[in-house]
């Protein structure tokens, strides 16, 4: 692409590298509260499908999760503490990766 005074022109749909992350485009999905986890804070199939459907974004930032038991803020908020929660997020990440997407927490 043609360069200007500020450097080469890039578009929203150009790929980008951020450290070890390679993004297929520069569209970033901001974290959105979904309140779809079960009573124990385990991501459900609905959460998995929600993120899978959005895997075409360059980068997905997951919704807020509680990293310690005392950190749960509201009903339906997922956690990342227990083995079941970790496995739930593993399924979410695998679904996004299967569609060619990148997700971070």
Language-model features and meaning:
Residues 1-104:
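Flavin-dependent oxidoreductase catalytic cores
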């Amino acid at each position: 692409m043609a360069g200007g005074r500020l450097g080469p022109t890039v578009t929203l749909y150009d790929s980008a590298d951020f450290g070890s992350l390679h993004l297929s485009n520069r569209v970033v999905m901001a974290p959105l509260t979904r309140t779809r986890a079960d009573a124990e804070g385990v991501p459900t199939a609905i959460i998995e499908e929600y993120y899978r459907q959005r895997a075409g974004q360059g980068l997905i930032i997951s919704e807020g999760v509680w990293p310690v038991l005392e950190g749960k803020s509201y009903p339906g908020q997922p956690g990342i503490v227990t083995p079941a929660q970790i496995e739930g997020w593993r399924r979410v990440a695998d679904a996004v990766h299967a569609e060619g997407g990148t997700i971070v927490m």
